[in-house]
Regions:
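Phosphate-binding site of ATP-dependent enzymes
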Residues: 163-244, 265-272
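Short, flexible, mixed-charge acidic loops at enzyme active sites
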Residues: 84-89, 214-222, 278
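ATP-binding N-terminal substructure of ATP-dependent carboxylate-amine bond-forming enzymes
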Residues: 1-101, 105-111, 130-138, 308-311
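ATP-dependent carboxylate activation and anion-phosphoryl transfer catalytic cores
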Residues: 2-15, 118-120, 235-312
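Active-site nucleotide/adenylate-binding loops and adjacent lid/helix of ATP-dependent enzymes
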Residues: 2-20, 49, 64, 105-185, ...
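A glycine- and small-aliphatic-rich helix-loop capping segment at beta-alpha/alpha-beta transitions
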Residues: 86-95, 164-165, 169, 295
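A short glycine-rich, hydrophobically flanked beta-strand micro-motif that places a catalytic Asp/Glu
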Residues: 50-55, 182-186, 256-268
Length: 312
């Protein structure tokens, strides 16, 4: 259960907040929607906020626009890969969410999964793909069916299922367009879930039911046939299990502030961590606000909680 948090509104109302959104990644349009929603929430709470498209990022380094805290609403490379976090640290500007090193680790599926394998956090078997690989051998080694993913893209961009060598070769080419590193994961066939984390506490899990082959970009942002079940319907024991696993995965990367952990059950029902999102979407369709609402936290309060959690 999420604890009540007393928000220091007097403190926040005296600050100048920059909302960094947009950017140049493949998730730009989603980031624009997230930033606008955050801006509306802060404005409604009387907080002095400025929207800054990352393409115009020179502004927040300019003396003409002094900012106390940056609310990072950038998704994907350029926002979740540690680049902007390192820059803000150089400028000594405080910001929401995880630090640069944690962001770099979380955005890389192969690096984070390698760590989880080492410390016993359950995640699907995987292999980094190369153009010279024997696709049939690779497929056999991962159980005969795989999900191919770009290493550092979010929102399921560039992901493809493969059930034979020809499909695997094609899937590799698709993913390679989005990332220099491509991985193949053993196919997980159980239900998909996500667990949001706010100030080191877990929010109720969400079960995702997609009408498409898998929960892809279209299903996430444009489909009316994707169902989000929250609370997810898990038993109390299973809910505790998935929340503990999500929190362990999050903390193992030294992530902080807020984030979302995506998981999927295997054929035996065991939960497997897919990835950690260090800057979850904050649109009307986004999962983080849905989980917060299930915990009794409305959107405006959620935004204030994230902002108030930035260390003074």
């Amino acid at each position: 259960m999420i604890k009540n948090q007393e928000i220091n509104l007097d403190y926040l109302s005296n600050l100048s907040i920059g909302i960094l959104y947009g950017g140049i990644s493949n998730e730009r349009e989603i980031s624009l929607k997230s930033g606008e929603a955050i801006f509306s929430a802060l404005s409604a709470s009387g907080i002095n906020a400025t929207l800054i498209d990352h393409k115009d990022a020179v502004l927040w380094a300019d003396d003409q626009l002094p900012l106390d805290i940056i609310f990072i609403a950038l998704h994907g490379p350029g926002g979740e890969d540690g680049t902007i976090q390192d820059k803000l640290d150089e400028l000594n500007i405080r910001y929401t969410g995880s630090r640069g090193n944690s962001s770099k680790l979380a955005i890389s599926k192969c690096k984070s999964k390698r760590l989880w394998k080492q410390i016993g956090v359950q995640t699907a078997d995987f292999k980094i793909l190369n153009e010279t690989d024997d696709w049939a051998t690779t497929l056999e080694g991962l159980g005969g069916s795989v999900m191919v993913k770009p290493d550092s893209e979010g929102s399921s961009i560039g992901m493809t299922q493969a059930f034979n060598a020809r499909q695997l070769a094609c899937a590799y080419k698709v993913a390679k367009k989005y990332s220099g590193t491509v991985i193949a994961e053993s196919m997980l066939t159980g239900s998909e879930y996500t667990v949001s984390i706010l100030s080191d506490e877990t929010l109720p899990s969400i079960k995702i039911e997609s009408a498409t082959k898998f929960y892809d970009f279209e299903a996430k942002y444009f489909s009316d046939n994707t169902n989000y079940i929250c609370p997810s319907g898990l038993s109390k024991k299973r809910e505790e299990e998935i929340q503990l696993l999500a929190l362990r995965a999050f903390k193992s990367l030294n992530c902080e502030g807020w984030g979302r952990v995506d998981l999927m059950a295997d054929a035996d029902g065991a939960f497997n961590v897919l990835e950690v999102n260090t800057i979850p979407g904050m649109t009307k369709k986004s999962l983080f606000p849905k989980a917060a609402k299930a915990a009794g936290i409305e959107f405006e309060e959620l935004v204030l909680r994230i902002l108030d959690g930035v260390k003074q």
